[in-house]
């Protein structure tokens, strides 16, 4: 998993609340169990005018040329609600997004994102609105998300602080998923196992 320390990137926004996981990655695309290849289906029902995904919707934000290559997504409250599917952060990450900034997230989506290297940043509704206004008013507007300082820097230079559980921050800073986190304690695990009495093995 790629470590997340500080990232500066083009920002794009979907100014909607309660974006659920079926909107993020519709159920018909969930048959794969590997993490790659989901980006093309991200927001499928909004991005395309046809079921096959051959006709882009020119009015959808992510299809606008000015947002091509965006790596930071701004959204409204309760992002990632709905059914539990790890494919949602897989699709967002495979599309090229590194961070999602919103006033709130659904709990399961929030945890799944952290476990898959996607940083969910909670800011106040007013702070998210300011970021959206700045991004809308300036083509090519970039936002910096610094996990080392837990700050978001807007295109105009305004700084907003956010919080993240230290365990989650440690995993993201070091690029550790659940398996990687376990392996990072390999020495301690080995010492523990070496001291287990033979009759308990």
UniProtKB/Swiss-Prot annotation:
Its EC number is 4.2.1.33. It comes from the Bacteria. Pathway: Amino-acid biosynthesis; L-leucine biosynthesis; L-leucine from 3-methyl-2-oxobutanoate: step 2/4. It holds the Pfam family Aconitase_C. It catalyses: (2R,3S)-3-isopropylmalate = (2S)-2-isopropylmalate. GO terms for cellular component: 3-isopropylmalate dehydratase complex. One of its GO terms (biological process) is L-leucine biosynthetic process. GO terms for molecular function: 3-isopropylmalate dehydratase activity. Keywords: Amino-acid biosynthesis, Branched-chain amino acid biosynthesis, Leucine biosynthesis, Lyase. Belongs to the LeuD family. LeuD type 1 subfamily. Catalyzes the isomerization between 2-isopropylmalate and 3-isopropylmalate, via the formation of 2-isopropylmaleate. Heterodimer of LeuC and LeuD. This is 3-isopropylmalate dehydratase small subunit. It comes from Shewanella sp. (strain MR-4).
